[in-house]
Amino acid sequence: TSKPVQNRELQGYESTDFXGYFKGGLKYKAGGVASGFNHVLTNXLSAQRLLHVKGRRVVRATEVPLSWDSFNKGDCFIIDLGSEIYQWFGSSCNKYERLKASQVATGIRDNERNGRSQLIVVEEG
């Protein structure tokens, strides 16, 4: 008889095997214990969140505070305002991260907004 196997993964340091289960990349949402596990409505067209997109092999979209202090010129960000989804590309971000950020933004539009959001590209500088 075989027994179940339990593995531990640390956020931001996930194993290749674990990350392989998420073909579209990983999304880290704000909340958890600190928020009291409050329900977040992702399908509402009134959503307001900022996602920091990083990674080459495994794309990680991490929810960060919606503030100019969160931005930097070396990375890509997605500003999700519900009916509009802005793809913000820093002046020093690489082509691969731009492509991945576009894929994440398209996924949000198609899967979380049922195609009802407008995608808008913004270049820094």
Swiss-Prot record:
Protein name (database record): Scinderin
Q: Give the location in the cell.
A: Cytoplasm, Cytoskeleton; Cell projection, Podosome
Q: Where does a 1,2-diacyl-sn-glycero-3-phospho-(1D-myo-inositol-4,5-bisphosphate) bind?
A: 23-30, 49-57
User: Main location per UniProt?
Assistant: cytoplasm
Question: Where does the record place the modification Phosphotyrosine?
Answer: Y13
Q: Name one GO molecular function term.
A: actin filament binding
- Name the source's superkingdom: Eukaryota
- Keywords, comma-separated and alphabetical: Actin capping, Actin-binding, Calcium, Cell junction, Cell projection, Cytoplasm, Cytoskeleton, Phosphoprotein, Repeat
Provide one Gene Ontology cellular component: cell projection
Species, as recorded: Sus scrofa
Homology family: Belongs to the villin/gelsolin family.
The processes (GO biological process) annotated in the record are:
actin filament capping; regulation of chondrocyte differentiation
Quote the Gene3D superfamilies the UniProt record gives. Answer: Severin
Q: What does this protein do?
A: Ca(2+)-dependent actin filament-severing protein that has a regulatory function in exocytosis by affecting the organization of the microfilament network underneath the plasma membrane. In vitro, also has barbed end capping and nucleating activities in the presence of Ca(2+). Severing activity is inhibited by phosphatidylinositol 4,5-bis-phosphate (PIP2). Required for megakaryocyte differentiation, maturation, polyploidization and apoptosis with the release of platelet-like particles. Plays a role in osteoclastogenesis (OCG) and actin cytoskeletal organization in osteoclasts.
Task: Return the Gelsolin-like repeat spans.
Answer: 59-99
The record ties this protein, via Pfam families, to: Gelsolin
